Amino acid sequence: MSQFIAMNRFKIVPGMESEFESIWKTRNTYLEDVPGFIRFNLVKGPKREDHVLYASHTLWASEQDFEAWTKSEAFRKAHEGAGSRGHLYIGHPDFEGFTIVEGAGVG
């Protein structure tokens, strides 16, 4: 079974980067005990004229593990209150899912 990468791309209002990052740094993701979860990263991309790009990046043992998480209590808890922070975002997050075909790495 192939590993799976799940990414959400966020367009953040310029000047709101610190607030956005603080939310991610202080929240409980509830991922540690989810079957198939391997790793999480929040990454910051380029600053554009109208937004700053961020992406959440999670690595899963399989796409099935990711799908099961999206239907779980842990997912619901991790996303509580997300709708109350609309002032930070330009539009909705864009989801992208990828099956790993080939890879290399250390450790």
Tell what function each PLM region has:
Residues 1-4, 41-53, 80-107:
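Glycine-rich beta-strand-turn "strand-cap" elements at beta-sheet edges
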Residues 4-10, 41-72:
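Short, well-ordered beta-strand segments in beta-rich or mixed alpha/beta enzyme
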Residues 12-20:
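Short, surface-exposed ligand-recognition loops at beta-strand->loop->(often short) alpha-helix junctions
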Residues 16-17, 28-29, 33, 44-47:
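Intrinsically disordered, low-complexity segments enriched in polar/charged residues with Gly/Pro
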Residues 18, 64-66, 103-105:
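Residue-level signal for secondary-structure boundary sites
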Residues 26-38, 59-96:
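An amphipathic, aromatic/His-enriched active-site/gating alpha helix that lines ligand/cofactor pockets
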